[in-house]
């Protein structure tokens, strides 16, 4: 049995969408240039979707060198950032536009 490239592409897209939907969502809010909660625990070895809600009127940049993530989130906007699967440990993140106040930590714990 042979499959056309289009059918294979559709199947790959479907499987990717299923994997993305299966990732648990954790909400982070930026308010008054502070991430809330400032510490988030996630299980090791699992992909997680961070829903970052910027309640401020100004943009903020979610940045983490350890996670290799960087995303500007406009004021009053939301963004989705996928992380993981990760090994146990602490992974700091910060808001590049307000680094003194916008700081947080993703703590990855063994199941």
PLM regions with names:
Residues 24-27, 74-111:
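Extracellular/periplasmic metallocenter environments
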Residues 1-9:
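Bacterial N-terminal signal peptides that target proteins for export
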């Amino acid at each position: 049995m042979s499959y056309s490239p289009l059918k294979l592409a559709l199947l790959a897209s479907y499987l990717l969408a299923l994997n993305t939907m299966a990732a648990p969502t954790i909400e982070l809010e930026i308010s008054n240039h502070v991430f809330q909660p400032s510490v988030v625990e996630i299980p090791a070895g699992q992909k997680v979707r961070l829903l970052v809600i910027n309640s401020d009127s100004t943009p903020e940049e979610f940045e983490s060198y350890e996670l290799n993530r960087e995303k500007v989130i406009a004021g009053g906007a939301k963004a989705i950032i996928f992380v993981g699967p990760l090994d146990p440990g602490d992974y700091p993140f910060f808001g590049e536009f307000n680094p003194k106040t916008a700081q947080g930590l993703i703590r990855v714990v063994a199941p």
